Amino acid sequence: MVAMIAYGAMWAVFSATGPRIAHERAIGWTRQLRVTPLRPASALSGKLVTALAAALPAMVLVAVTAVASHHVQLSAAQWLAMLAAMWAGVLPLALLGLAIGYLAADEIAFPLTMALYFALGALGGLWMPPSVMPHAMQDIGQALPSDAVAELGWRITGGQASVPKAVLVLAAWTLGSATAALLAYRRHTIRSAP
């Protein structure tokens, strides 16, 4: 259940950012926005909030399905803590999607996003338990945000509150992805300046 929640949230934030922004760039929408009074920070934060909002229905639907069809039982506090932590955990993935959207061409953004989605899902332990993977893949997976998001959920549902490694991994990816997104946006605005 936790892996599917992470996988669904990851796709939601990627599909709301990368390919969509690349398409908006291709049709000239981002250039149109720059001639309006809308500040760039507001435009970027709007994209980010939209991506995070898109993740919520996917997460909640998987949780409801887990309860309805598999009789998963957690306390209300565990459900809220798990969903909130995992929702916050997809922030670096949404930022990474922003970077892809502002860097990749329209025809490349979707395949690139899909490849990244599958790689993060497989290597991050969302397709199969990380413990059955070769050690090299486990080591790679532990450094990925997809594994860290799932680790938050697994720890919370297992009654373990301590998740410092997952939080550190997500913090590092958030910093790196935010930097990449800002640099990509600046590059885009410089290249498409009138």
Predicted regions and their residues:
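Alpha-helical transmembrane segments and their short interhelical loops
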Residues: 40-113, 163-171, 176-181
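Short hydrophobic, aromatic-rich alpha-helical segments embedded in or entering the lipid bilayer
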Residues: 128-167
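Short cytosolic juxtamembrane segments of multi-pass membrane proteins
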Residues: 186-194
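Hydrophobic/aromatic residues in alpha-helical transmembrane segments
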Residues: 13-17, 61, 95-96, 119, ...
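Transmembrane helix segments
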Residues: 104-143
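Transmembrane helix-loop junction
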Residues: 23, 66-67, 71, 98-102, ...
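Long, hydrophobic alpha-helical segments
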Residues: 1-19
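Transmembrane helix boundary and interhelical loop/hinge segments in multi-pass membrane proteins
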Residues: 13-38
